Amino acid sequence: PSLSFFQESSEEYQIPKLSLLQNIHSSTKNILSDDALNENARMLENVLDDYGVKGEILSVKPGPVVTLYELEPAAGLKANRVISLADDIARSMSALATRVSTIPGRSVIGIELPNDIREKVLLREILSSRAYGDSNYQLPLALGKNIGGEPVVANLARMPHLLIAGTTGSGKSVGINTMILSLLYKLSPDQCKLIMIDPKMLELSVYDGIPHLLSPVVTDPKKAVIALKWAVAEMEERYRKMSKMGVRNIESFNLRVKEAIKNNENFTRTVQIGFDENTGEPKFEEQSIKPEYLPFI
């Protein structure tokens, strides 16, 4: 089998509109009043006191799924003493589960209790946030919200590898689609190209035909091997280009290309044009080539 590649499109890419995504105001919000949060904090202090744990709840940070209570333990109280009470705290607070852990760099202990109503974290809300819109990440991924309800955006370009795992129905496909849309809402096809391999033929078929694809969504395992071999060859070719340019990454390479285009410069490459008739030695010549940006793949 052979792998077919799309031809470059001359049409100008338009970033999708956020209005295509579900509206923020249509989702269920879990908004607790300050009085309710303070009441829960006092109740938690009483529960801890019943188990002989003295301390004070300094702050309460409600998130979309859990609420974080920051406990300042009394002097001499070991953190392991509080951590070992996680199951008892959950039972006393009528919660399904409780997570208790120390907070690095601080003297407080974090106690996470699940909210009665889980708030939906919508992609539109993350993509419209400053954390995503103002980020200078090359490949931004909208991952959701942290425990404090703040948007979490990661840079795929800084990840050597990314493994997504989980049980059936845990949200792996939703996570992958969220990451793909994060790239499509930020980068044009000239900046980012995608190779999608989907042996199940169900997960990624909706993306067939988008301009970012180097080839149609690969569903044949044999063609998947060809696609991966092509990616390795392309990687090695890019290493050679960057080595010749004296740069270490795609971002630096594209900056060099930008300068060359601005100064009307051309790059050169050495190609073999044949063999010398007398000596049989290979003959080379320098060819001038137009500088072109390297998209992320």
Residue positions per predicted region:
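Low-complexity, intrinsically disordered P/S/T-rich segments
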Residues: 1-153, 158-161
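P-loop NTPase catalytic phosphate-binding loop
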Residues: 9-16, 103-108, 112, 131-262, ...
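Catalytic-site microenvironment of enzymes
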Residues: 265
